[in-house]
């Protein structure tokens, strides 16, 4: 009936908002990181990073090289098992030798941010070393 349908829609909307809100600080952090790295550390001969916000479509945020396809991301951020209570996962493909996955609680944004900074700065260092 109509009442059940409205309740389901309301429940779905509340669940979506919880997911989007729990990823908000991670999006702001990764977006800021990409801006700073592009501004200060990317050389003229390197591609820039892009932070793609898909929180509303797929519940994901990812960082990739500008010219790379979306599925060629470097860092992927999403909610573990689509449940904000279970935490946030950051998958890391910045090192071609070793892909890794790291779990963070929603309140560990600074720890997660440090992790993303380390991964991307090491990637930039490897790219620069290749050019020399």
Language model features with spans:
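Context-gated lysine
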Residues: 8-10, 39, 64, 80, ...
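Intrinsically disordered, low-complexity regulatory segments enriched in Ser/Thr/Pro
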Residues: 67-110
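Amphipathic, interaction-prone secondary-structure segments
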Residues: 43-81
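Ampiphathic alpha-helical segments that act as solvent-exposed interaction surfaces
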Residues: 94-132
């Amino acid at each position: 009936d109509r009442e059940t349908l409205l309740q389901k829609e309301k429940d779905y909307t509340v669940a979506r908002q919880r997911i989007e809100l729990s990823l908000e600080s991670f999006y702001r952090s990764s977006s800021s990181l990409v801006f700073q790295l592009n501004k200060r550390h990317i050389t003229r001969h390197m591609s820039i990073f892009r932070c793609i916000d898909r929180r509303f479509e797929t519940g994901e945020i990812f960082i990739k090289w500008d010219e790379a396809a979306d599925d060629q991301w470097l860092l992927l951020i999403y909610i573990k098992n689509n449940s904000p209570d279970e935490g946030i996962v950051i998958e890391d493909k910045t090192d071609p030798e070793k892909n890794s996955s790291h779990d963070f609680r929603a309140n560990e944004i600074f720890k997660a941010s440090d992790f993303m900074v380390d991964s991307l700065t090491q990637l930039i260092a490897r790219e620069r070393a290749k050019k020399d």
